[in-house]
């Protein structure tokens, strides 16, 4: 595959994923408030599920065009999920003295992300 084409697919997918994450964070912030970063958590969990789906489809169907992986996994999921925002929000919880929220958010994000990725793979492999 052409390297330049791969970069364009990743950039396009990343731009779309970033826009979706922003809209999700904006919506959750307006509906539920900002006491817990629901938008970031939801984006990271959904992105983990989607990347599991993409890689499972790629494994299950050998003719799956690798370009889709660049667009969807590296691009969309890479732009949609955000470890840096998760890290900053977690740091802010710690700095503000919200220790239980801090630990809960870390556990929910990490264990939930792995669980959602597993669920995405499991769903494709079993249906």
UniProtKB/Swiss-Prot annotation:
Protein's name in the database:
Fluoride-specific ion channel FluC
Q: Which residues form a coiled coil?
A: none
Q: Span of the secretion signal?
A: none
Species whose genome carries this gene: Leptospira interrogans serogroup Icterohaemorrhagiae serovar copenhageni (strain Fiocruz L1-130)
Q: How is its activity regulated?
A: Na(+) is not transported, but it plays an essential structural role and its presence is essential for fluoride channel function.
Q: Which Pfam families match?
A: CRCB
Could you mention a single GO BP entry for this protein? cellular detoxification of fluoride
Detail which positions bind Na(+): 78, 81
Function statement: Fluoride-specific ion channel. Important for reducing fluoride concentration in the cell, thus reducing its toxicity.
Q: Which GO terms describe its cellular component?
A: plasma membrane
Return the similarity comment.
Belongs to the fluoride channel Fluc/FEX (TC 1.A.43) family.
Keywords assigned: Cell inner membrane, Cell membrane, Ion channel, Ion transport, Membrane, Metal-binding, Sodium, Transmembrane, Transmembrane helix, Transport
Annotated InterPro entries: FluC
Lineage from the top down?
A: Bacteria, Pseudomonadati, Spirochaetota, Spirochaetia, Leptospirales
- Give GO terms: molecular function aspect only: fluoride channel activity; metal ion binding
Reaction(s) catalysed (UniProt annotation): fluoride(in) = fluoride(out)
Q: Which gene encodes it?
A: fluC
Topology relative to the membrane: Multi-pass membrane protein
Spell out where the chain crosses the membrane: 8-28, 37-57, 68-88, 100-120
Protein localization: Cell inner membrane
């Amino acid at each position: 595959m052409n390297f330049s084409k791969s970069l364009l697919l990743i950039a396009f997918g990343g731009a779309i994923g970033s826009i979706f994450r922003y809209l999700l964070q904006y919506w959750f912030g307006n509906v539920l408030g900002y006491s817990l970063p629901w938008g970031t958590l939801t984006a990271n969990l959904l992105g983990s599920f989607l990347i599991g789906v993409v890689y499972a489809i790629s494994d299950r169907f050998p003719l799956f065009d690798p370009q889709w992986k660049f667009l969807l996994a590296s691009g969309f999921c890479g732009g949609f999920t955000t470890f840096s925002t998760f890290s900053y929000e977690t740091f802010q919880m710690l700095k503000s003295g919200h220790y239980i929220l801090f630990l809960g958010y870390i556990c929910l994000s990490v264990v939930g992300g792995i669980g959602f990725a597993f669920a995405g793979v499991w769903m494709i492999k079993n249906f």
